[in-house]
Amino acid sequence: MNSKASEQPQVSPGDNEHAQDGSTSCAKNCARYTNDDASAALEERLPPLPPRPSTLSFLDEGYTSSRSIRQTSQVNLQAKATTAVSLTDIGFRQSSEGDGEDHSAPDFPEPLRAKASLNQPKTSKGSDAGDSTSIGSTIPNVELGEVENVFSDFLAAEPSAPQEDGSGLLQFPEFRADDAEDEFATEFEPIGDLNEQGENEELLLERWKSKRKHYLILSAAGKPIWTRHGDGGLISGYVGVIQTIISFYEDAKDHLSSFCAGDTKFVVITRGPLHLVAISRLHESDTQLKSQLEALYMQILSTLTLPSLTHLFSVRPSTDLKRPLQGSETLLSTLADSFTKGSPSSLLSALECLKIRKSHRQAINNALLKTRVGSLLYGLVVAGGRLVSVVRPKKHSLHPGDLQLLFNMIFEAEGVKAGGGENWIPVCLPGFNSSGYLYMYVSFLDLREDSGSTANETATKEESVAIILISTKKESFFELQGMRNAFVEQMDKNESIKIIKEAIKRGRPTTTDIVPGTVLHHFLYKSRANVQFTMSAYGPESSSTFRLRRLMSTYNDLHSSVHAKHAHVKVHHCVSQSTSSFAWVTPRFELYCVASPNANRNALAQSASKIVQWVQQEEERLFIIGGAVF
């Protein structure tokens, strides 16, 4: 396989694809607060991105023939950076590594301040003895008076007096809520099959229309390729209407992006010979739905590759793509369902890592490097969808969107695990090179035995630990198998398997573990430089699929609003009847929090600053900074 490599891109916070994009303001729903005093320091820019790998140019926006495939334009990927490397030259402050796992935020006597400057003492490597702490944006533990230095406008502006209706409920500006828990519980159930006489067609169509979220993929000729609910024959009439609307705009030399019908939003993207459509009655923005459609398109490319897809339709525009995609429907469905349930990784365009000590992660990295074979391109250790370790060539990198596709295949669809202890899978990683296949060796570990035996198929997703070894050579199965065995032996010796097991059992910390007595129920924190995120454990407020969806709807609204066009805000606060939500965005990080609707603003501000300082203290445990290279 031919692939072109380039230096790994490193993201500057100002280049985050959402930071300048968005839509209209949410004046009716939200109150925004900007701190002018801190803006000068926070808006300093990092160096611009180096060029993206030239292979990404295959991901084109419009239809192209196979002859012009090398001239196609770049697809809008979910993120602009990789997780494998990051801004490793950012200054660090050294802190000693204790013996225990203390989740609580530390105390600092300095006044509250926020810094975005890179002009800090630099060290190219963190301490081998202890976990280092970034000082790029120092938010020490402070008292209320010092919090006001950053959140002065936020604390000064009080919400308008609440109004009471006949039911006695307080009428704050509120996000639209997802209605009924019982109704949402049936969202992922199949609608059934049409009988031979077609007598149940009306019933099936009613079930289809009751779904809150639909994804459709059809060809430029209007032929249904895949739909999340039902089948192309059952909903052919609706597909025809959508195709007619798209064609009307194309004939007018216009591009249909989205439209609304009542409370239903339709979003359309065209990629080559395919139209991808999202139909949603959930609270999601156009940008969020387009990002989900991009991921589905990348899932198709991971099966077919872009040259194959383009060639099929250039030879025969009415090609039925169902047969080439046979076996991939489950991957598309599980990916789509993760978006419907609510995916922090998709929302933030970032990956989550398993929290372990820096020295422990380094031991796993060293074991990967020590056992590396010549045919290895990438090596990953993944625990329940959370990245533990990655090894890569110095001038190659993995795109977060590619890793999300791999994690969906391995941990969500369950097709790989059902195949047994070892799997050998050809896969295209569109963010790396959309024109050819890589070959992936996957093996699961059984954490219940503290050994390298293959995992039992009954292990849950959170209990599943996968070793993923990727090569460009399709004959390298046995070489990678030998590497896996040697790597597991090394992890047995240095007790890395035990460490991973304990980290999984420990789980994510709760908000009260980090900030005792906090008013926060949950938070999401994204490190923009590392393109990774961390979050607290889900509490009782998110105990069901429906409640988790409502939480993610709140985050969707908050994220959409704070990243809206011309929304140059630092702090954003919204109060509804059910929640109080809070966003704090700087060039270095994004913090999103949810609390009860009557949460005190001062308490919100103090808790937010303590969450940020805790993340910075634990940075090299929470995130993979640099990774292992060879």
UniProtKB/Swiss-Prot annotation:
Membrane topology: Peripheral membrane protein
UniProt main location, coarse: membrane
Biological source species: Aspergillus clavatus (strain ATCC 1007 / CBS 513.65 / DSM 816 / NCTC 3887 / NRRL 1 / QM 1276 / 107)
Pfam families registered for this protein in UniProt: Fuz_longin_1, Fuz_longin_2, Fuz_longin_3
Cysteine disulfide links: none
Higher taxonomy: Eukaryota, Fungi, Dikarya, Ascomycota, Pezizomycotina
Region called Disordered, residue ranges: 1-63, 93-140
Residue ranges, compositional bias (Basic and acidic residues): 101-113
The family this protein is said to belong to: Belongs to the MON1 family.
Entry keywords, A to Z: Autophagy, Endosome, Membrane, Protein transport, Transport, Vacuole
BP GO terms, sorted: autophagy; protein targeting to vacuole; vesicle-mediated transport
PANTHER family: SAND PROTEIN-RELATED (PTHR13027), VACUOLAR FUSION PROTEIN MON1 HOMOLOG (PTHR13027:SF7)
CC annotations in GO: fungal-type vacuole membrane; Mon1-Ccz1 complex; multivesicular body membrane
Keyword Cell membrane: no
Biased composition (Polar residues): 1-13, 117-140
Protein's name in the database: Vacuolar fusion protein mon1
Gene field: mon1
Free-text function comment from the UniProt entry: In complex with CCZ1, is required for multiple vacuole delivery pathways including the cytoplasm to vacuole transport (Cvt), autophagy, pexophagy and endocytosis. The MON1-CCZ1 complex acts at the fusion of vesicles with the vacuole, through its regulation of the SNARE complex during the coordinated priming and docking stages of fusion, and particularly at the stage of tethering/docking.
Intracellular or extracellular location(s): Endosome, Multivesicular body membrane; Prevacuolar compartment membrane; Vacuole membrane
Protein transport is among the record's keywords: yes
